[in-house]
């Protein structure tokens, strides 16, 4: 591994509950729709635009407008996103990689403003930020990871990606990158993550693995 690429929501920060609360509340308050577990999981890891377009398609009979829903969603999340704490091991892993001079990238489906707010709020030493809004297709399409590799002039095969969602793992593998899955422990579905190169319980596991490898090469 020469480059480290991280998803953000649910991987670096525990924001999935925040996203879920805001998305479900908007659909319920604006359109009287109660999103089920499977339905919300289907959109996990996808962009905000993809979620809103999906809702407009599924609930056209309720008058769901993708553009209006997206505007309301982004307004609420711009305020709520920094409420999400770092995931266990996130700071330690990122700081260690930074100390080892490993280039670090965030490649997230979230808007760039959200990513910047999180990096600033938590003082993370990450300067290359790639948003899914910069590419035409969202995860599970590999576009956001392909863009990340281009931003740092990296061979995709030399990049290691950390992802918590099935859509993200599929996208990273399609980009030709090595993938470590850190699944959401509240909803474990190990068979869906079988295409990942590794499955870790948390980012502390990843840190321990990398430190052990580093010690063997010294």
Question: Where are the regions that the model predicts?
Answer:
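Conserved catalytic-core motifs of eukaryotic protein kinase domains, centered on the activation segment
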Residues: 17, 108, 117
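Asp-based, Mg2+/Mn2+-dependent phosphohydrolase catalytic module
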Residues: 1-2, 95-98, 111-218
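Short, flexible loop segments at the rims of nucleotide/cofactor-binding pockets, characterized by
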Residues: 81-85, 107, 176-179
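N-terminal helical cap/lid subdomain that shapes the substrate entry/recognition surface
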Residues: 1-92, 96-100
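Conserved phosphate-coupling serine/threonine residues in phosphotransfer and NTP-handling enzymes
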Residues: 11, 108-110
């Amino acid at each position: 591994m020469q480059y480290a690429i991280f998803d953000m929501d649910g991987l670096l920060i525990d924001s999935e509950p925040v996203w879920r609360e805001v998305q479900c509340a908007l659909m319920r308050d604006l359109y009287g729709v109660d999103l089920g577990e499977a339905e919300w999981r289907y959109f996990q890891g996808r962009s905000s635009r993809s979620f809103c377009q999906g809702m407009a398609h599924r609930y056209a009979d309720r008058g769901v407008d993708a553009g209006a829903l997206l505007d309301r969603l982004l307004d609420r999340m711009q305020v709520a996103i920094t409420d999400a704490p770092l995931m266990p091991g996130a700071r330690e892993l990122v700081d260690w990689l930074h100390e080892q001079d490993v280039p670090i990238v965030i490649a997230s489906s979230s808007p760039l403003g959200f990513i910047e707010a999180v990096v600033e709020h938590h003082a993370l030493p990450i300067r290359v930020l790639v948003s899914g809004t910069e590419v035409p297709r969202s995860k599970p399409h590999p576009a956001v990871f392909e863009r990340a590799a281009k931003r740092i002039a990296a061979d995709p095969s030399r990049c290691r990606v950390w992802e918590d969602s099935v859509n993200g793992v599929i996208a990273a593998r399609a980009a030709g990158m090595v993938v470590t899955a850190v699944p959401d422990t509240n909803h474990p579905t190990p068979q869906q993550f079988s295409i990942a190169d590794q499955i870790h319980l948390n980012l502390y596991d990843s840190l321990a693995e990398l430190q052990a490898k580093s010690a063997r090469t010294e």
